[in-house]
């Protein structure tokens, strides 16, 4: 009796789980010769929102972990990827039509990227941070911090090495990621998700969506809870890079306007100001410290900050979106 093979189902990876698309949609993945390989889930707007929610929920713990701990997690990914090297080589050969030596070099390079950034996890702060010379009786120190949720459009041609090369730099500093994998060849990305699920990466730190980048990218760009965009894999279907930046700027402006209105309403409740502007002497509980009053210098406190520059009537306004002014 002939045994039937068990076909693999390629799903999304959201919050450490493998759900099907909320819409129930799938699309066909073909090999370099046009032959059928598999069906992959086609992410919807709801899936993109769920991925952002999962990434935001994981931000605190991942950003709060020590650099040494994050380095250990990234190195563990490299270990597991090394153990499944032959599987990834075969998937790259089938989906991208690469020769055996080229596929092997790409998988080896992807493993090396994880090892490289694992080593940087507890060192980049010393390189990027510094003490700044100031004319005053205090210290001024710059230190890098996590941005938050980063939405990434992965390169379309290099489905594994390109994907790893955009994910690892975002993770090393404590960001969480929502990545749209290569639409044409997403098999390696979903197999990488299986590696992540069995590694020490907390659920929600990396979320992988498959489907149309042109369809998903605008939803991510306009999401108020996405802090940064990486358009490494943006192609003609998304328009020119300048068009992408313009749409992103419009979405950010709308989000800032909504956030500023929320801040004014909250300040009105806290301090009783009719115009929603904080007066001298009022300090929000979310503040993390004070800076010397030396003109326009904004202390980042999450989404709120104090602008120490005063207006003509002696009032100080609230900065939204954690702006930094020097």
Predicted regions and their residues:
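C-terminal segments
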Residues: 2, 112-127, 141, 230-326
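Hydrophobic/aromatic ligand-binding patch that stacks against planar heteroaromatic rings
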Residues: 168-171, 219, 244
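Conserved small-residue-rich beta-alpha loop and adjacent elements
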Residues: 119-202, 299, 326
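Generic beta-strand/beta-sheet core signal
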Residues: 153, 173-176, 180-182, 209-211, ...
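Nucleotide-activated donor-binding/catalytic signature segment of Leloir-type glycosyltransferases, i.e.
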Residues: 205-206
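Short acidic active-site motifs
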Residues: 138, 215-216
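N-terminal Rossmann-like NAD(P)+-binding subdomain of aldehyde/semialdehyde dehydrogenases
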Residues: 1-136, 290-295, 304-309, 313-316, ...
């Amino acid at each position: 009796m002939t045994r039937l093979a068990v076909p693999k189902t390629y799903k999304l990876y959201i919050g450490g789980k493998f759900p099907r698309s909320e819409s129930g949609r799938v699309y066909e993945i073909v090999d370099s010769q046009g032959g059928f390989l598999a069906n992959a889930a086609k992410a919807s707007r709801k899936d993109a929102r769920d991925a952002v929610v999962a990434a935001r929920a994981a931000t605190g713990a991942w950003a709060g972990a020590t650099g040494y701990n994050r380095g250990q997690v990234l190195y563990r990914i490299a270990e597991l990827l090394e153990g499944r090297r032959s599987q990834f080589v075969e998937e790259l050969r089938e989906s991208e039509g690469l020769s055996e030596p080229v596929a092997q070099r790409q998988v080896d390079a992807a493993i090396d990227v994880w090892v490289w950034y694992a080593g940087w996890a507890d060192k980049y702060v010393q390189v990027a941070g510094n003490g700044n010379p100031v004319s005053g009786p205090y210290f001024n120190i710059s230190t890098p911090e996590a941005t938050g949720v980063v939405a990434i459009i992965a390169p379309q041609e290099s489905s594994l090495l390109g994907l790893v090369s955009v994910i690892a730099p975002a993770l090393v500093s404590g960001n969480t990621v929502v990545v749209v994998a290569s639409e044409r060849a997403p098999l390696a990305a979903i197999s990488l998700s299986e590696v992540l699920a069995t590694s020490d990466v907390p659920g929600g730190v990396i979320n992988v969506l498959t489907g149309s980048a042109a369809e998903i990218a605008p939803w991510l760009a306009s999401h108020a809870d996405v802090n940064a965009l990486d358009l490494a894999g943006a192609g003609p279907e998304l328009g020119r890079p300048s068009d992408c930046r313009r749409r992103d700027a419009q979405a950010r402006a709308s989000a800032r306007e909504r956030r500023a209105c929320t801040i004014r309403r909250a300040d009105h409740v806290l301090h009783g100001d009719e115009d929603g502007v904080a007066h001298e002497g009022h300090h929000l509980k979310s503040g993390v410290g004070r800076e010397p009053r030396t003109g326009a210098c904004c202390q980042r406190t999450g989404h709120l900050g104090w602008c120490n520059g005063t207006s003509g009537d002696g009032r100080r306004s609230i900065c939204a979106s954690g702006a930094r002014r020097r």
